[in-house]
C-alpha cells in the first residue's frame, strides 16, 4: 500500500480522483494504446484499451459506450492514450508528433518527449497477415510499463513484408540513429512477424538494450508449409546469431498455428551455448494461440516482470 500511495502521489493526473478511480487509472496506464480512461457520474473510473486505428476515435467511441452502459450514467473523457484532457476536446488536445527516425514513426496521438527528455525509446513492430493493413494495429500492452517509466513510443510499420533482410537492416539502422540522437536506451518489441524482425535486427548489430519477442513467426501457418524443417532451421539460425548484451525475452503459447514445435527448446540451447541469459516464457497457463498476447490479460500478468527484467535483469514471478 505504501508503494501504491507513492505511485499515486507522483501522478498528477490521478491526484483528484477517488480511490476506486485511482486504482483503475493505474491499471489503465499499464495497458496498450489506443486507450481511454473515463469517469462516470458515480465518480468511478472506467477504461478501454488496446484498440486499433489510425487515431483513438474508435477507442473513444467504444469506451464511452461501454462506460455509459456499465455506470448507467453519462461519462466524461479524462485521458486519451497518455494525454490528460483536463476538460479539453480530445482533438484539440492532439499532441505534436516527433519526426520519424528512419523507418520508425511515432505512435499516433501519443505525447513523446524526444531523446533528451525521455528515459528511452521502445519500438513496437506488428504482425502481418496478407490483405490486412496492420499499420493501424494496436501495440500489445507490454509496451506500457516502459512508457510509464518515461520511454517514448514509436512503431516499425510495414504494409507489405517482402524483404525480410532489408526490414531487419532498416530497423537496426534506425536504432543506431536513435542512439545517435541521444536516446539512452532502446528496446525492440513485437509480435509474430514483428517479434521475428526484432530478433533479426539484433543479429545485425542493432545497439539495443532489450528485445521482447512474442510468438515470433514469418513462414505462415504450419498447415500451409510443405516442409516445416525450413522454418525451424531459420529460427535456429536467428537465435544462434544473438550475442550476449541486450536482455532478451521470448514468448511462445500453446496452440500457436504458426509454431512448428521445439522453438523454445532451440532458443534455450542456443542461448546457453552463446552465453545469452534470457527470459523464456513458454506455454504459460491460461494463454492459447498465436494472438494470446493481444488484449489486456497478458500484459496485466507479465508486463511488470518483463519490464523489470529488461531494465534491471531482475527476475520476478511469473517471469522467473
Show which residues each predicted segment covers:
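N-terminal signal peptide c-region/cleavage motif recognized by signal peptidases
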Residues: 10-12
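Primarily recognizes the serine-hydrolase "nucleophile elbow" in alpha/beta-hydrolase
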Residues: 185-239
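The feature captures the conserved acid-bearing segment of alpha/beta-hydrolase catalytic domains
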Residues: 216-280
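Conserved alpha/beta-hydrolase
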Residues: 145-162
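Short, surface-exposed "cap/lid" segments of acyl-processing enzymes
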Residues: 105, 113-146
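Secreted/extracellular ectodomain signature
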Residues: 14-108, 120, 132, 142
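C-terminal catalytic histidine-bearing segment of alpha/beta-hydrolase fold enzymes
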Residues: 274-320
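Alpha/beta-hydrolase active-site loop
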Residues: 162-181
Amino acid at each position: 500500500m505504501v508503494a501504491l500511495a507513492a505511485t499515486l502521489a507522483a501522478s498528477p493526473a490521478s491526484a483528484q480522483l477517488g480511490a476506486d478511480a485511482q486504482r483503475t487509472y493505474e491499471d489503465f496506464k499499464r495497458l496498450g494504446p489506443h486507450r481511454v480512461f473515463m469517469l462516470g457520474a458515480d465518480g468511478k473510473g472506467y477504461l478501454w484499451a488496446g484498440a486499433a486505428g489510425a487515431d483513438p476515435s474508435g477507442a473513444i467511441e467504444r469506451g464511452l459506450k461501454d462506460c455509459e452502459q456499465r455506470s448507467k450514467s453519462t461519462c466524461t473523457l479524462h485521458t486519451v492514450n497518455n494525454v490528460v484532457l483536463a476538460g479539453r476536446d480530445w482533438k484539440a488536445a492532439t499532441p505534436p508528433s516527433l519526426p520519424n527516425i528512419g523507418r520508425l514513426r511515432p505512435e499516433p496521438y501519443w505525447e513523446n518527449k524526444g531523446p533528451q527528455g525521455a528515459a528511452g525509446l521502445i519500438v513496437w513492430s506488428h504482425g502481418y497477415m496478407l490483405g490486412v493493413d496492420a499499420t493501424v494495429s494496436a501495440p500489445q500492452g507490454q509496451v506500457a510499463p516502459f512508457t510509464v517509466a518515461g520511454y517514448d513510443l514509436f512503431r516499425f510499420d510495414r504494409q507489405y513484408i517482402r524483404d525480410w533482410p532489408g526490414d531487419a537492416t532498416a530497423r537496426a539502422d534506425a536504432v543506431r540513429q536513435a542512439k545517435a540522437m541521444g536516446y539512452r536506451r532502446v528496446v525492440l518489441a513485437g509480435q509474430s512477424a514483428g517479434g521475428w524482425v526484432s530478433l533479426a535486427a539484433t543479429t545485425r548489430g542493432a545497439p539495443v538494450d532489450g528485445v521482447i519477442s512474442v510468438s515470433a513467426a514469418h513462414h505462415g501457418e504450419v498447415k500451409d508449409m510443405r516442409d516445416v524443417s525450413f522454418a525451424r532451421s531459420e529460427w535456429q539460425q536467428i537465435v544462434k546469431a544473438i550475442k550476449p548484451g541486450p536482455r532478451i525475452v521470448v514468448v511462445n503459447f500453446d496452440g500457436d498455428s504458426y509454431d512448428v514445435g521445439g522453438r523454445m527448446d532451440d532458443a534455450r540451447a542456443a542461448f546457453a551455448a552463446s552465453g545469452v541469459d534470457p527470459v523464456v516464457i513458454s506455454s504459460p497457463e491460461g494463454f492459447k494461440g498465436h494472438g494470446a498476447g493481444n488484449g489486456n490479460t497478458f500484459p496485466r500478468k507479465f508486463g511488470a516482470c518483463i519490464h523489470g527484467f529488461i531494465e534491471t535483469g531482475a527476475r520476478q514471478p511469473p517471469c522467473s
